[in-house]
Regions:
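A non-catalytic alpha/beta surface segment that caps or lines the substrate-entry region
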Residues: 70-119
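Generic non-transmembrane alpha-helical segments
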Residues: 60, 64-67, 71, 94, ...
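Midchain, well-structured core segments that form catalytic/ion-binding scaffolds
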Residues: 34-42, 178, 184-346
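Short amphipathic alpha-helical face segments that pack within enzyme cores
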Residues: 94, 146-154, 297-301
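A generic, well-ordered mixed alpha/beta core segment in the N-terminal half of proteins
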Residues: 132-210
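Cleavable N-terminal signal peptides of Sec/SRP-targeted secreted and luminal proteins
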Residues: 6-24
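Catalytic-core environment of secreted peptidases
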Residues: 102, 114-147, 152, 274, ...
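N-terminal hydrophobic or amphipathic helices/low-complexity stretches enriched
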Residues: 20-77
Length: 346
């Protein structure tokens, strides 16, 4: 995991190593051809071309990660950075500042996806993109998503320091609202970029748990938009030729095995369900156990049944929230609900 600078260095270097050798496999000649096609100059061993002396600024990268973590609505070491809040706006400003320092062309779309572009020698070609997100669920860690954004920017810095000259333009993207924390919609920015019309329509009426609409929340963060603006986020075909994301593992397997890098071949896709239970409410001291129909216990039994199933099947399930309308120790529950998320690669 990239909590240590040397691991972060290897992962940052890997991100662009994969880009420039995407078609190479173990074929050195193919690697050279790929480098030439991507960079726009012949690959040689005579010392000409870009420097092969790549040194990642691990200390600088770690410092940026720590600075970004300070924009949080929860105390360190946790991070809470929810879409369109003041801390989210501060984090966006910080990322754009680094992009500007690197000499990238910076732009934002209508919902706040941020793009830092390093123009290639042939800008008409589809760009190579990399990046991730910086919003954070309540009380999370400081690496999720952030490593993919700051790591990509350090990779750009590294390539610039080494006199690399890209043929295809390179773009670092900071996606808006990867997390579903505020409006219950995950990957909001990237799904709009993918042209999901149903999502664009739904954003006209969606509200958060404080009854603040998406459009009002966006305006509070400086993004005044309407439905037509949402359509402007949709990407044109062939905008990008490739995309790669650097990400922390978020699990214990690689760390436990002492493996510094893993390449994803499949990812568990989520499916979320909300289940409502309705029982018979009553006084906790007066309704005898045989006469009870407790919604909370029914919810607990379902959660345990799902756990048993996924343990046997190899899938994953998480009970995210449990709500009790009574919320009192002197009443047995008449109405309750649970939110579950299941994940699998099948």
């Amino acid at each position: 995991m990239p909590s240590k600078p040397n691991a972060a260095s290897r992962l940052v270097f890997l991100a662009f190593l994969l880009v420039i050798s995407a078609a190479a496999a173990n074929d050195d000649a193919a690697a050279r051809r790929t480098m030439e096609q991507f960079a726009g100059f012949p690959a040689s061993d005579d010392g000409e071309g870009p420097s092969s002396d790549f040194h990642v600024d691990s200390e600088g990268l770690q410092r940026q990660i720590d600075e970004l973590a300070s924009f949080s609505d929860s105390p360190a070491p946790s991070v809470t950075r929810v879409l369109y809040t003041d801390k989210d706006v501060q984090a966006r400003r910080y990322i754009k500042g680094i992009m500007n320092q690197l000499g990238l062309v910076v732009r934002e779309d209508a919902v706040g996806n941020i793009f830092g572009r390093w123009e290639g020698s042939e800008p008409g070609l589809g760009a190579v993109a990399t990046g991730s997100h910086v919003d954070a669920i309540p009380f999370s860690g400081k690496f999720d998503g952030v490593v993919g954004v700051l790591g990509a920017l350090e990779a750009i810095s590294l390539l610039k320091r080494s006199a690399f000259l890209p043929k295809r333009s390179l773009e670092v993207i900071m996606f808006t609202s990867e997390e579903p924390t505020r409006f219950g919609i995950s990957c909001l920015g990237s799904r709009l970029m993918a042209g999901i019309e149903e999502l664009a329509q739904s954003l006209r009426k969606v509200v958060d748990n404080q009854n603040v609409s998406f459009l009002d929340a966006a305006e509070s963060a400086g993004y005044k938009l309407n439905l037509e603006d949402l359509h402007s986020v949709f990407l044109k075909t062939d905008k990008y030729s490739a995309f790669i994301e650097l990400h922390i593992e978020q699990g214990p397997i690689l760390e436990k095995e002492g493996i510094p890098i893993g390449i994803v071949t499949a990812i568990a896709a989520p499916a979320s369900l909300k289940v409502d239970f309705e029982g018979n409410g009553g006084h906790a001291g007066a309704v005898l156990m045989p006469a009870r129909n407790d919604a909370g216990l029914a919810a607990a039994e379902l959660a345990l049944a799902v756990e048993k199933h996924v343990l046997e099947s190899g899938s994953i399930d998480t009970v995210g929230t449990v709500d009790d309308e009574a919320a009192a120790t002197t009443s047995d529950e008449g109405v309750g609900s649970i939110n579950e998320m299941g994940l699998d690669i099948d």
